[in-house]
Amino acid sequence: PYAGPVVFLLLGGFLLALGIERWDLHRRIALTVVSLVGVRADRLLLGFMIATAFLSMWISNSATAMLMVPIGIAVIVSVGAVDEHDRKSTERDEEDDLLVGVRGEPVERPATGFGLALMLGIAYSASIGGVATLIGSPPNAVFAGVAESRLDVQISFLDWLVFAGPLSIVFLFVAWLLLVKLLRPEIPIEQGAEDVIRTQREELGGISRGERRMLAVFTLVAAGWLLRPFVLQPLFPAITDTVVAIVGGVLLFVVPVDYEAREFLLDWSDATRLPWGVLLLLGAGFSLANAFRESGLDTVIAESFAGVAGAPLVVLVLVIAIVVVFLTEVTSNTATATVFMPIMISLGITLGESPLMLMATAALAASMAFMLPVATPPNAVVFGSGYVTIPQMSRIGLWLNLLGIIATIVLTYLWLPIAFATAG
């Protein structure tokens, strides 16, 4: 299980993310997207959320939040989107504000509508964007790995994107509308926001050779994942999404940026920052799923749900979504998905329902935790900025949790049979 295809798929994805981070390509993408939407409060919020969600599709949710929070804080400080009565006690230079966001040191600094909306928007869109791809969030990879090992159903990168991509896009705009309606963000000084974004883009300078080559490798890998079923697989059936990911990861170590200086897109000093813990947790999860099966524990647990045998499938999906969403508020989403996947398989078989549908419900619901700082790393990073309090996050997050449950049910019940029609 520790050397399964999904583990290596995630390994390749992590290497790609490290390369993107090393050459600051993610920062350039984020600032470009934000600058395109304009500086009106609602548009600026949408720009930040789109940029965050897109990056979160390819690099970890926590790394995305760590990138976007300092940029967001710089904008908030520049436009004066902090309560007037908090100014005297919170005056500090811009560098200190950025460090607070990066270090995650909570401070007493409530923000008005725009500051609060921007911080929450970054946290929520980091989680929402991660839903869209197999490498975006560990529960997605857990789902694919268990489906392949237990059901012999192969979920490709494109399969998952077709399935979860629409949810990610629609739910991103739902979250944006909710923040706009509930918080009514306004920018006191629009020019300040424009100046900050322009200054940060100027600091990046022109696109470097490393960025260009990193973008080329990233585009090649993404195209390989998306076009593999149509272009690569008919010619080379042995090529899987995992092969594409590993080839892309290897390319990062051999594509030179400055050959004479022996500088490449990635070196081992960068690779030591790989999140090995996540890969080990994933392998442990697959081992746990096998242990559930071999011991018969999954069947015992599934049979304990015999009381819901006569309930409609939509009710069963609703119950699973509610339980997983609120459980994930206080536990790791990866751990939650790992425990639930084998149970969902046995439950589906016991009740005569589609195990894949129940598993997908649990996988999606595990990423729909928006209420508490401990629920997800992006929530914790944003809370650490000091611009968001727990009651504020809980109040907005509860609405998103409920909407996330509804969206999960609709997607799995209506769209999954169509999206996964060719999977396997």
Tell where the protein language model's regions lie, with residue ranges.
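Membrane-embedded alpha-helical segments and adjacent helix-loop junctions characteristic
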Residues: 1-88, 93, 101-109, 277-351
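Membrane-core helix-loop-helix motifs of multi-pass transport proteins
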Residues: 86, 93-185, 381-412
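Membrane-interface segments at loop-to-transmembrane junctions
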Residues: 34-39, 105-111, 196-208, 267-276, ...
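Residues that define the loop-to-transmembrane-helix transition and helix capping
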Residues: 42-43, 116, 158, 242, ...
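Re-entrant/interfacial helical elements at transmembrane boundaries that shape
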Residues: 62-77, 119-123, 132-149, 192, ...
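Hydrophobic transmembrane alpha-helices of multi-pass small-molecule transporters
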Residues: 1-11, 17-18, 149-155, 159-303, ...
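A cytosolic-side transmembrane-helix exit/cap motif
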Residues: 1-4, 28, 83-96, 260-268, ...
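C-terminal transmembrane helix pair
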Residues: 96-101, 123, 165, 280-288, ...
